[in-house]
């Protein structure tokens, strides 16, 4: 095992992170003085020691920011498995000082200090004495040690201190044994003297006991006579009491019968009330439904009326529209007929023009050779004029075509827009359709929610009726139990709580509202706190005064009015201001299983603790009142779980109680039921509100649905109107395209005619044809024909214009007819809505009739139940009168029974006292026969004489016998303890001797091992000399003298084996001999300083063999050596390095550098150290500079 690497940061002079890689062999660190060489060895010591506390000296102190933390990390080679618990070939140990804490990490895992110590000790590292780290001055210190000091040093390395500590512990135990033996002997002497005096006292005690037994017998017989007399008296009283009980039982039976009858009638009455309540609820429900239904009917009727009015108006409008449509259809027929006739005229005119043109052409061809020059120019001009007219007409037709094409484009664009709007309206109608479906689903959900709410309301009403029935039952019990004054107190407190001038937060309420009691202790608490339940608790005196002023004010208001029995206030309100209550000291109740403090059985508001403590002070719950006489002597008030009470003044009340439930139970039950009723009512009210909200939502849904349907219908009508527009637009497109085609045909005809005229001119020019000479050849005149053609064309134009006008009129008629059709189409949808409303109205009216029948049924049922209730109440009143009579009789009988019970209680007290005395008679003692014949006077005289004799023994020690037995037991225990101490004394001696032997054996074995290597290493360092270690021991004479000296100093009373206290090994000396003369020996003190340092180094190297360490750390080991010794030491270290030992050395000498395997140069800049690997030349330069500085100084 050796150190492979050291990494440190913030440690001493090494501020920045520094890494140093080491190898096996000799590693030399060289640097100037104060550069930080020794800090590397200090870092190794910091890791290998158990220092885990925060120390400021380890932190770097330099220029710049202060360093708050540091760490040192060492990587060990574990190839030889020194750290046997780790399988890794390298072990990384790291210590970190941070935030005033030290943390240890092994292979990056945090461990505790104890685990770390165990880890180091497992691989042989002694953390308390690191003798393989040799600092400056440590070699000189060892070389100057005496023989005893060397021995102690070896012991500390070996761990012999553990033996010394064990030896000291054993010696202290031995001293304790001696002191205990002395005390036991003293106790023996004291016990003997005490035993003699107790023997006399015990004899007097026996005589006293005889007389006391006789007195007990006399008391016993006297008590027997008294007990018989009291027993006879009690039997007489019990027989009278039994007679009275029988009478009361008879009366009680009559009372129970009447109660049973009353409870039956009350049950009937409650059932009737419940039926009335349920009928009333159903009636209210039907009334509310009827009102709602009527509202809906009115609403629907109004809607239907409005729709019918609108329908009538629209029907009248439709009639006019139908008339208009019929008229339009007639006009359309006429126009179509007219158009047909015009079309036929146009065709006939065009044929006539064509015929005339043909005739002209024929004439021109016939008269080719007969034209004169005079008419030629005239005819040409005419034809050219005709051509000009045709050109004018062609230009006009061209404009018309452009105009019609432009109009056609506009119509096409308009059709695109209309198609787009159709798509938009279709999407809108689909959207409105989906919205209508959603509204339908929503309305169905709302109807379902309404049905569920109505079902919950019916369930809630049944629960409310049950709660009301329970309230009636509990209220009856409440009226029986609670006084009328308390009821009036509750009323006045309600008025106080409603008063604004009194702060409500200062009023805590009644005592019964501020406590909570378990069922087990309810009867006991009722007995004690019954008269305090309706005490009003307030915070301070000011609030109490305001309440009193308010009550007085109310009284004055009532006195000013006429007397009203119902409003008169009977009760007296008790008010307790908490701040004015006197506070008592805390009282500790006795720790007894048979009692429970009553205040611990009550859970209460912490503010009323002092008030409760005043009421329940020294009040306890006991199992039975018979066992509470001892507590009455200590002024405790006792009460049992059944509510029987015995006060500290001796007053007792309780016994048989017919009430099954007390005030607390009934009051809280009534309170809970009222809260439940309130919750149920609020729940029903909430459900009704939900139903109203659902109805409003349904109305909104129906309104939105009708508006959405109207929108959808509007979309449908717009789609229809757009379709009509598209149809008319398409018709216009068709007509315009026809018109354009017609114009094109006309243009072609005109072009043809123009070409013909041009041909005529050419013919005239070529042949000198004169068309005007037709009369000469016997044909029609060309001019007259041309005139006719012109007239025909004018007529044709007129007919065509008329045709276009009629066509435009036809389009307008079609448009009007489509508009009327769309309006009639919309009214069909509105008729469907009216039918739906009529169906809803019919259903509502049927439902209204059903509700009216239910109303009549429930009203009749309520009247019948009220009649039955009056009969039941009259019978209950009769039963109450009989009950009062029976109760009076029972009260008289109870009064007589109480008197007899009081007499019996006195007799029973006397009987109990006698019974107690009888119980106190010692068991196992036979009754004396002579006292059986004595009467009461003889027994009392004998008792007097015995008591006089007992007075003589008034000072007798009654505990003498007990003390004698105790003393004998103590005496036997002392004997046992004496024997145990002797055996332990012997065992301790044996243990001390065993420890001494073990220590000596370990020392001798270590000495043999060290001596061998010391001689070997010394011979390598001093070639002409030999050395050995000598173990010094005492001889017998010296041992006895030492024994005597120790015994005189300690002044022991008896002889002790002093081998326990004295070590026979006194020291280790070093004997040196010369090879030339072996008889001549030297000690270490006779050597020079350098030689002694070499011997000390040799001894240090030998100590390595104790734990087989494989590394050493020397700080300037060769400082005090001359050149020869440094050479020899270097050779020795080189030899040990070859054997596997690692050396890390700081030095200023060149000799060690010759044999070193690695050189490390340390430099310091601005109080920060830096280390790096260097060469021998660099190291020599640093050493030479240091030597020069040393010579100069």
Swiss-Prot record:
The flexible SMC hinge domain, which separates the large intramolecular coiled coil regions, allows the heterotypic interaction with the corresponding domain of SMC1A or SMC1B, forming a V-shaped heterodimer. The two heads of the heterodimer are then connected by different ends of the cleavable RAD21 protein, forming a ring structure. GO terms for molecular function: ATP binding; ATP hydrolysis activity; double-stranded DNA binding; minor groove of adenine-thymine-rich DNA binding. One of its GO terms (biological process) is cell division. Belongs to the SMC family. SMC3 subfamily. GO terms for cellular component: chromatin; mitotic cohesin complex; nuclear chromosome. Acetylation at Lys-101 by ESCO1 is important for genome stability and S phase sister chromatid cohesion. Gene3D superfamilies: 1.20.1060.20, 3.30.70.1620, P-loop containing nucleotide triphosphate hydrolases. Central component of cohesin, a complex required for chromosome cohesion during the cell cycle. The cohesin complex may form a large proteinaceous ring within which sister chromatids can be trapped. At anaphase, the complex is cleaved and dissociates from chromatin, allowing sister chromatids to segregate. Cohesion is coupled to DNA replication and is involved in DNA repair. The cohesin complex also plays an important role in spindle pole assembly during mitosis and in chromosomes movement. Residues 179-286, 332-483, 665-993 form a coiled coil. The modification N6-acetyllysine is found at residue 101. ATP binds at residues 31-38. It comes from Plasmodium falciparum (isolate 3D7). PANTHER family: STRUCTURAL MAINTENANCE OF CHROMOSOMES PROTEIN 3 (PTHR43977). This is Structural maintenance of chromosomes protein 3 homolog.
């Amino acid at each position: 095992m050796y150190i492979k690497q050291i990494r440190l940061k913030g440690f001493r002079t090494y501020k920045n992170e520094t890494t140093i890689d080491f190898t096996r062999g000799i590693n030399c660190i060289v640097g100037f003085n104060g550069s930080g060489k020794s800090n590397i060895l200090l870092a190794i010591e910091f890791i290998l020691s158990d220092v885990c506390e925060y120390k400021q000296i380890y932190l770097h102190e330099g220029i710049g920011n202060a360093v708050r933390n540091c760490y040192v990390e060492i990587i060990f080679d574990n190839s030889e498995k020194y750290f046997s618990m780790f399988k890794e070939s390298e072990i990384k140990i790291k210590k970190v000082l941070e935030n005033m804490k030290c943390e240890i990490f092994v292979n990056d895992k945090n461990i505790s200090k104890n685990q770390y110590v165990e880890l180091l000790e497992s691989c042989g590292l002694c953390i308390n004495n690191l003798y393989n780290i040799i600092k400056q001055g440590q070699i000189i210190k060892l070389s100057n040690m005496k023989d005893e000091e060397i021995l102690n040093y070896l012991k500390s390395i070996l761990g012999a201190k553990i033996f010394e500590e064990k030896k000291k512990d054993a010696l202290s135990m031995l001293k304790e044994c001696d002191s205990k033996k002395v005390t036991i002997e003293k106790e023996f002497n004291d016990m003997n003297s005490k035993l003699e005096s107790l023997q006399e006292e015990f004899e007097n005690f026996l005589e006293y006991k005889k007389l006391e037994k006789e007195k007990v017998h006399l008391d016993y017989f006297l008590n027997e006579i008294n007990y018989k007399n009291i027993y006879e008296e009690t039997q007489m009283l019990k027989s009278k009491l039994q007679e009275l009980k029988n009478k009361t039982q008879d009366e009680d039976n009559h009372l129970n019968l009447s109660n049973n009858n009353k409870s039956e009638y009350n049950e009937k009455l409650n059932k009737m009330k419940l039926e009335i309540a349920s009928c009333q609820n159903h009636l209210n429900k039907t009334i509310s439904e009827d009102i709602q239904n009527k509202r809906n009917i009115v609403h629907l009727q109004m809607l239907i009326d409005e729709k019918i009015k609108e329908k009538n108006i629209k029907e009248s409008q439709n009639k006019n529209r139908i008339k208009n449509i019929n008229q339009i259809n007639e006009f359309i027929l006429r126009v179509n007929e007219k158009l047909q006739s015009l079309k036929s005229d146009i065709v006939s005119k065009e044929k006539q023009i064509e015929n005339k043109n043909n005739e002209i052409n024929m004439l021109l061809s016939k008269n080719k050779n007969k034209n004169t020059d005079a008419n030629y120019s005239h005819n040409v001009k005419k034809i050219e004029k005709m051509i000009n007219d045709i050109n004018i007409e062609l230009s006009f037709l061209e404009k018309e075509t452009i105009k019609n094409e432009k109009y056609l484009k506009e119509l096409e664009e308009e059709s695109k827009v209309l198609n787009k709007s159709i798509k938009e309206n279709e999407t809108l109608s689909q959207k409105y359709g989906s919205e209508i479906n959603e509204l339908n689903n929503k309305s169905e959900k709302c109807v379902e929610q309404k049905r569920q709410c109505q079902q919950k309301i019916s369930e809630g009403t049944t629960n409310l009726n049950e709660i009301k029935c329970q309230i009636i039952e509990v209220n009856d019990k409440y009226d029986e139990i609670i006084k009328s004054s308390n009821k009036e107190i509750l009323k006045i407190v309600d008025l106080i709580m409603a008063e604004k001038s009194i702060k409500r937060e200062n009023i805590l309420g009644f005592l019964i509202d501020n406590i909570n009691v378990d069922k087990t202790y309810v009867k006991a608490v009722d007995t004690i706190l019954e008269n305090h339940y309706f005490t009003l608790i307030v915070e301070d005196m000011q609030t109490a005064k305001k309440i009193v002023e308010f009550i007085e004010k109310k009284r004055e208001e009532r006195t000013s009015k006429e007397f009203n029995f119902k409003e008169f206030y009977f009760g007296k309100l008790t008010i307790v201001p908490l701040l004015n209550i006197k506070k008592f000291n805390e009282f500790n109740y006795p720790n007894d299983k048979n009692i429970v403090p009553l205040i611990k059985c009550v859970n209460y508001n912490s503010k009323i603790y002092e008030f409760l403590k005043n009421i329940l002070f020294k009040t306890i719950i006991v199992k039975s009142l018979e066992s509470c006489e001892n507590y009455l002597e200590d002024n405790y008030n006792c009460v049992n779980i059944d509510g029987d009470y015995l006060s500290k003044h001796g007053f007792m009340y309780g016994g048989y109680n017919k009430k099954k439930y007390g005030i607390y139970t009934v009051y809280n039950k009534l309170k809970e039921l009222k809260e439940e009723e309130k919750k149920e009512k609020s729940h029903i009210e909430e459900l009704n509100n939900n139903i109203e909200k659902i109805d409003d939502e349904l109305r909104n849904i129906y309104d939105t649905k009708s508006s959405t349907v109207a929108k959808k219908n509007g979309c449908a009508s717009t789609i229809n109107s757009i379709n009509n527009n598209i149809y008319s637009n398409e018709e216009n497109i068709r007509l315009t395209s026809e018109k354009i085609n017609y114009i094109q045909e006309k243009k072609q005809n005109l072009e043809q005619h123009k070409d013909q005229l041009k041909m005529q001119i050419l013919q005239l020019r070529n042949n000198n044809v004169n068309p005007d000479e037709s009369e000469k050849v016997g044909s029609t005149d060309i001019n007259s024909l041309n005139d006719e053609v012109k007239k025909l064309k004018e007529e044709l134009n007129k007919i065509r214009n008329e045709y276009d006008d009629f066509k435009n009129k036809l389009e307008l008629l079609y448009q009007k007819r489509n508009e009327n059709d769309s309006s009639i189409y919309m009214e069909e949808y509105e008729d469907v809505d009216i039918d739906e409303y009529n169906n809803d109205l019919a259903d509502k009216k049927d439902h209204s009739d059903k509700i009216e029948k239910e109303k009549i049924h429930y009203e009749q049922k309520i009247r019948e139940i009220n009649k039955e209730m009056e009969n039941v109440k009259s019978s209950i009143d009769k039963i109450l009168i009989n009950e009062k009579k029976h109760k009076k009789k029972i009260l008289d009988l109870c009064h007589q029974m109480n008197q007899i019970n009081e007499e019996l209680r006195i007799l029973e007290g006397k009987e109990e006292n006698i019974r107690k005395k009888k119980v106190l008679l010692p068991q196992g003692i036979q009754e004396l026969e002579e006292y059986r014949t004595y009467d009461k006077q003889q027994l009392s005289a004998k008792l007097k004489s015995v008591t006089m004799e007992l007075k003589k023994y008034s000072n007798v020690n009654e505990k003498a016998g007990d003390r004698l037995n105790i003393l004998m037991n103590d005496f036997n225990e002392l004997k046992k303890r004496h024997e145990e101490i002797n055996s332990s004394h012997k065992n301790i001696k044996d243990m001390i001797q065993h420890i001494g032997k073990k220590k000596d054996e370990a020392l001798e074995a270590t000495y043999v091992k060290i001596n061998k290597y010391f001689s070997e290493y010394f011979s390598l360092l001093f070639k002409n000399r030999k050395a050995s270690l000598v173990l010094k021991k005492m001889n017998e004479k010296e041992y006895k003298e030492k024994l005597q000296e120790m015994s005189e100093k300690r002044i022991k009373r008896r002889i002790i084996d002093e081998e326990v206290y004295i070590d026979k090994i006194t020291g280790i000396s070093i004997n040196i001999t010369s090879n030339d003369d072996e008889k001549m020996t030297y000690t270490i003190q006779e050597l020079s300083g350098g030689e002694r340092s070499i011997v000390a180094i040799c001894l240090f190297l030998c100590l390595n063999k104790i734990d087989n360490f494989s590394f050493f750390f020397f700080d300037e080991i060769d400082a005090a050596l001359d050149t020869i010794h440094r050479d020899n030491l270097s050779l020795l270290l080189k030899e040990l390095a070859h054997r596997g030992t690692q050396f890390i050395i700081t030095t200023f000498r060149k000799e060690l550098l010759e044999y070193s395997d690695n050189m490390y140069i340390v430099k310091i800049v601005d109080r920060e150290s830096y280390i790096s690997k260097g060469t021998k030349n660099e190291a020599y330069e640093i050493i030479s500079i240091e030597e020069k500085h040393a010579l100069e100084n």
